[in-house]
Amino acid sequence: MLDWPKLGEEAEKRITALPIWDIAVQTENRAGLNVCTYAESVPDPLLRKAIELNGFEERRHRHVLANLVEAYGIKLAPEPVYEKPKDPEWAFMVTGYSECIDSFFAFGLFKAAKDTGYFPPELVQTFDPVVNEEARHILFFVNWVAWHRRNMPLWRRPYFELKVFAVWIFLIYERMGIASDVSNGQQDNNFTVTGAEQLGSDINVGELIAICVAENDRRLKPYDVRLKRPRFVPFMARIALKFIGPKKKTA
């Protein structure tokens, strides 16, 4: 159990009012289950151990979040019953690609929350290592994809590429549904994409995307240059910046 700092009244109100805690706890719990279930099917001992560590860290993130909401009296909706996925590889890929999206925006939002003072320094210090672990998770995942693709039989590759495509379609469809739920006042599952407004910041969309790109590069820079980096989301973000780059604020 972490010794959570006592926050000022305004800071505590800001933190407890964020519409993310239910889904954050549930997402980490589900991610831990998906990753650990896939690890059980991996025959290589070293790779299995690495994936198990990934799953352990996902579950640890869940406990950190659960301790936070308990410490600050945040009410959570009851968690659903999680069942082991029937297709462990699909579940692992959904979790991995989903984290590639969410972590990219989370890097920028965390930076914005830190710089604007929305997150008090005490919480920044607590969560910065968690954010760094998410960077390592997505780096591990995209290199697993490359390794898995290279080592599978040629006849399996078309099926695998279709599976990758299906995962992306699923994630896009899921986020479209999330956006609809948010507009109807439900819990904000898509906070990592819509979070600038929730943070009460006057950062415009172009500025937020630019921060996300810079923070994504910074978080991944310390790792071996031979390792592959997530490319799709940063690539799309850079294209978006050509059209909606940071706007100059009027005096």
Residue spans for each PLM region:
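Non-heme di-metal
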Residues: M1-A251
